[in-house]
Amino acid sequence: MNLYEYLSQGIKHFTLIDPDKSVDYLRIARYALEAGTDGILVGGSLGITASQMEKVVKDIKSVANVPVVLFPGSLSQLTDAADGVLFLSVLNSLDPYFIIGAQVHGAVLIAKHYPRLEVISTAYVIVGDGGAAGFVSMSKPIPYTRPDIATAYALAAGYIGFKALYLEAGSGAPQPVPPDMVRAVRKAFPRVLIVGGGIRSSEVARSIAREGPNVIVTGTLAEESPEKLGEIVRAIKQR
């Protein structure tokens, strides 16, 4: 089973580890694995070199029995030590660089230097507050109250041919992507749907899980509260 097939089947929880913010990333990975996470995303910040990323991924894979997937915040965050990469295009960025510019350069790097990486083309759509991701990518986030706009982006992503769509409220967002927005996007986008940002309780995770996403992502909970992370993972699976 390849990575895309794995993501497509059922509903899963992934833990996002940002090695630039989490020095003790192995401890966080172990907490997440003990909590029952189904996969680990690595990346996010801008201050990670290619050699650092390779070491982090190899270290995590040495203790993980789940897929380790790149979530690159820059072109330097590529390594074929990972199981795959979310090849992100920030659809609601106001800067063409984040829609297609970085992707052109990244595609050449992957083809030449990391051909073993499984590439998952991913429409990245920033919602609500947007957090650091929205600020850095110069995005115009979709308001929480406008599922119709999110649906329009989802339809466009499907027609263009993206394999996955990631609804991102942003790290540390005051609230997550609303369940009604997830529901609307699920109806419009038949492929892999990922939702992340602002999910801090099992109740919120369950309400989102019931709307049919394939993957729900949480970040710092593994470090801040391993017990709460376990509750969230169970809520997602038992929805």
Curated annotation (Swiss-Prot):
It catalyses: sn-glycerol 1-phosphate + (2E,6E,10E)-geranylgeranyl diphosphate = sn-3-O-(geranylgeranyl)glycerol 1-phosphate + diphosphate. Pathway: Membrane lipid metabolism; glycerophospholipid metabolism. Its main location: cytoplasm. Sn-glycerol 1-phosphate binds at residues 166-172, 197-198, 219-220. GO terms for molecular function: magnesium ion binding; phosphoglycerol geranylgeranyltransferase activity. It holds the Pfam family PcrB. Its EC number is 2.5.1.41. Keywords: Cytoplasm, Lipid biosynthesis, Lipid metabolism, Magnesium, Metal-binding, Phospholipid biosynthesis, Phospholipid metabolism, Transferase. Its cofactor is Mg(2+). InterPro entries: GGGP/HepGP_synthase_I, GGGP/HepGP_synthase_sf, GGGP_HepGP_synthase, GGGP_synth. Mg(2+) binds at residues 18, 45. The keyword Cytoplasm applies. One of its GO terms (cellular component) is cytoplasm. It is an enzyme of class 2 (transferase). GO terms for biological process: glycerophospholipid biosynthetic process. It is found in: Cytoplasm. Prenyltransferase that catalyzes the transfer of the geranylgeranyl moiety of geranylgeranyl diphosphate (GGPP) to the C3 hydroxyl of sn-glycerol-1-phosphate (G1P). This reaction is the first ether-bond-formation step in the biosynthesis of archaeal membrane lipids. Belongs to the GGGP/HepGP synthase family. Group II subfamily. This is Geranylgeranylglyceryl phosphate synthase. The lineage of its organism: Archaea, Thermoproteota, Thermoprotei, Thermoproteales, Thermoproteaceae.
